[in-house]
């Protein structure tokens, strides 16, 4: 199976609780390689741009306000079947419904403050990684 990439965001709630290190360590234990990483504080306009597909939905303003309230940690991660595996490791969007041991179950508080964001499919991952990282910022894949 070929290597795949996905975007991970450690959201403001998890950053404020100083759980980013534990989350990154867990992702590495699960076989993800960090290909790019940066800590940034999104402006409201940047958050609106990233979540543009949700514009017009009832939760959009609250989401944008939350994501721009304090720094986040964005990462381009790589492994086989990265998107699906990441979704499995982070768990359901609602921490109350997430499986035991998943990142959202361990570190999330509610549907809005659920610790992490993850791409939902490979095409989305490519777009999301490009939103945060210029091509030269992402380490190339290892060759055999």
UniProtKB/Swiss-Prot annotation:
GO terms for molecular function: ATP binding; metal ion binding; nucleoside diphosphate kinase activity. The keyword Glycoprotein does not apply. It is found in: Cytoplasm. InterPro entries: NDK-like_dom (IPR034907), NDK-like_dom_sf (IPR036850), Nucleoside_diP_kinase (IPR001564). Pfam families: NDK. ATP binds at residues 11, 59, 87, 93, 104, 114. Its main location: cytoplasm. Major role in the synthesis of nucleoside triphosphates other than ATP. The ATP gamma phosphate is transferred to the NDP beta phosphate via a ping-pong mechanism, using a phosphorylated active-site intermediate. This is Nucleoside diphosphate kinase.
